[in-house]
């Protein structure tokens, strides 16, 4: 029997996964107590990471290969992926002006026995990729400007392992493999065995031009080896080998997928990205709530270790805009899986810059304190997640109740979050209404906002910083993560200089990520001039929110002292 212990109302069950083991001696859990729920989670995760010798998120930067906008073949083509079908989709992206930075060729590309679900060879299926995978990669890069191309693989080789008499086994060497109790041939548990498996395959993929990978089915390993290998034996060396080799061969550009079991996420030393949910289910719109809840609540822990992948989405979908909003707030890879003819550039516009770069928050969005222990599918208030971007806080509300609309409540969502720096008043910008509202401390917290039906969403920006200046740059307001599109300070001498500042005014220079509609918060109506590349531009004022169309990236703001 698996050992267990109960302390008060807290019960811990411990299992080894290996038959015959009757005693365990190790740290099984970390517990922290405090007023800040995010801080106590962070403390526990940091302790666990130190104990296991793995990096926390601050030492796992998002790989450059996955930082732009991507497209994955899975929900578009499934296992019927081919070079011809990929090129058809790329033609659509080019015609619609969608800048795709990376392409992930998912399950179906490799040489497999589809009935036995085993891996035959380490190369591409010759019928689907008749001129080889490298030809497809070259087309994507040279004809369509795709910068990075990745492929899918399973942690165990393929769903049921490797074909015993296949070319893959001959190339890797049978001595580097092991047979499970039900006859599946998989990479062996020692680091040397796992390294030989992945070194052989990743090296071949690099020769084909592949520079990122998605490794699926990771938490299946302990199930496949149940009774024979403990959780640690099933995962520690296999993950260590994979992580280090992907870091060496591909700069760490890997999506860890279906690896949300503790034996997986506690044993990856350095890889940066992990999926935080089950698959996006595009044909079942009712799955929205479950998908978002999985991602947001799992991110409470995962964002302390990894860059969170909230999975692909469709831009033509009943809840496309809400899915896009949530992917923007994931702080991880952002990619769609649209089928041919189904991409809606209008949904992608707020997510991306014109060159395919993706503005991101500092960390993945998580539920606000008031939502941590509530069931959002039946609550009166709309569900809310929060993420930060510099001194701005983003609040995204989503209707989660399929039976009735839910009310946006800003004061409730902010309760328990850190106060505005310096104890000042909060200002909230409603992105949809393009208005700004002052939230005074002690104001009526019963005041309510709009209603959201199931799948509807609304985004707010909250200034959490100090009031060192009269105006607060928000950024390109047409982009979801607007604060990530502006930086205070400019790197040249254009615009306002000391010679043309008035004695009774002050000024600030900012740099935009690209030209566009720039927004700033001006609570006391002190802004007197906005210049783009030295030229004064018209400013549209809606209360405390000011907006100006800028055709350059250098912007200078001047206000009354």
What name fits each language-model region?
Residues 64-229:
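Aromatic-lined carbohydrate-binding/catalytic grooves of carbohydrate-active enzymes
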Residues 1-102, 120-127, 143, 148, ...:
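Carbohydrate-recognition beta-sandwich/jelly-roll modules
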Residues 425-445, 531-546:
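Solvent-exposed beta-strand/loop surfaces of large extracellular or lumenal domains
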Residues 442-480, 541-561:
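C-terminal beta-strand-rich structural cap/linker in extracellular carbohydrate-active enzymes
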């Amino acid at each position: 029997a698996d050992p267990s212990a109960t302390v008060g109302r807290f019960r811990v069950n411990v299992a080894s996964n290996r038959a015959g083991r009757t005693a365990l001696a190790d740290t099984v859990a970390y517990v922290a107590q405090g007023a800040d729920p995010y801080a106590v989670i962070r403390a526990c995760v940091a302790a666990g990471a130190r104990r296991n010798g793995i990096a926390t998120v601050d030492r796992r930067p998002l790989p450059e290969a996955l930082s732009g906008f991507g497209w994955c073949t899975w929900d578009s083509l499934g296992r019927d992926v081919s070079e011809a079908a990929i090129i058809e989709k790329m033609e659509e992206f080019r015609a619609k002006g969608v800048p795709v930075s990376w392409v992930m060729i998912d399950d179906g590309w490799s040489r497999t026995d589809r009935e036995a679900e085993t891996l035959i060879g380490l190369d591409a299926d010759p019928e689907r990729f008749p001129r080889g995978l490298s030809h497809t990669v070259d087309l994507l890069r040279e004809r369509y400007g795709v910068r990075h191309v990745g492929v899918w693989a399973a942690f165990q080789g393929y769903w049921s392992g490797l074909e015993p008499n296949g070319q893959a086994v001959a190339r890797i060497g049978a001595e580097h493999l092991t047979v499970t109790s039900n006859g599946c041939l998989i990479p062996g548990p020692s680091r040397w065995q796992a390294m030989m498996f992945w070194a052989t395959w990743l090296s071949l993929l690099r020769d084909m031009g592949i520079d990122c990978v998605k490794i699926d089915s990771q938490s299946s390993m302990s199930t496949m080896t149940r009774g024979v290998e403990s959780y640690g034996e099933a995962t520690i060396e296999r993950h260590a080998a994979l992580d280090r080799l992907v870091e060496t061969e591909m700069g760490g550009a890997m999506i860890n997928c279906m690896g949300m079991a503790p034996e997986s996420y506690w044993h990856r030393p350095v890889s940066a990205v992990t999926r935080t949910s089950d698959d996006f289910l595009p044909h079942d719109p009712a799955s929205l709530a479950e998908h978002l809840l999985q991602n947001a609540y799992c991110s409470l822990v995962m964002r302390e270790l990894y860059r969170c992948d909230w999975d692909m989405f469709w831009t033509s979908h009943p809840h496309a805009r809400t899915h896009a909003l949530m992917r923007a707030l994931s702080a991880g890879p952002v990619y769609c899986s649209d089928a041919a003819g189904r991409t809606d550039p209008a949904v992608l516009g707020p997510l991306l810059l014109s060159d395919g770069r993706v503005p991101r928050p500092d960390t993945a969005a998580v539920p606000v304190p008031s939502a941590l222990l509530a069931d959002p599918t039946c609550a009166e208030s709309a569900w809310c997640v929060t993420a930060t971007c510099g001194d701005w806080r983003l609040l995204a509300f989503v209707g989660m109740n399929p039976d009735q609309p839910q009310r946006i409540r800003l004061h409730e969502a902010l309760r328990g979050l850190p106060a505005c720096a310096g104890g000042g008043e909060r200002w909230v910008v409603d992105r949809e209404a393009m208005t700004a509202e002052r939230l005074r401390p002690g104001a009526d917290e019963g005041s309510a906002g709009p209603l959201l039906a199931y799948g509807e969403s609304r985004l707010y920006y909250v200034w959490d910083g100090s009031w060192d200046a009269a105006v607060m740059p928000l950024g390109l307001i047409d982009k979801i993560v607007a604060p990530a599109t502006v930086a205070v300070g400019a790197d040249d001498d254009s615009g306002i200089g000391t010679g043309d500042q008035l004695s009774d005014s002050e000024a600030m220079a900012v740099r935009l990520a690209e030209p566009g509609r720039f927004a700033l918060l001006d609570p006391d109506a002190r802004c007197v001039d906005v210049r783009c590349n030295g030229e004064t531009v018209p400013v549209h004022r809606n209360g405390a929110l000011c907006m100006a169309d800028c055709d350059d990236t250098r912007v200078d703001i001047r206000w009354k002292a």
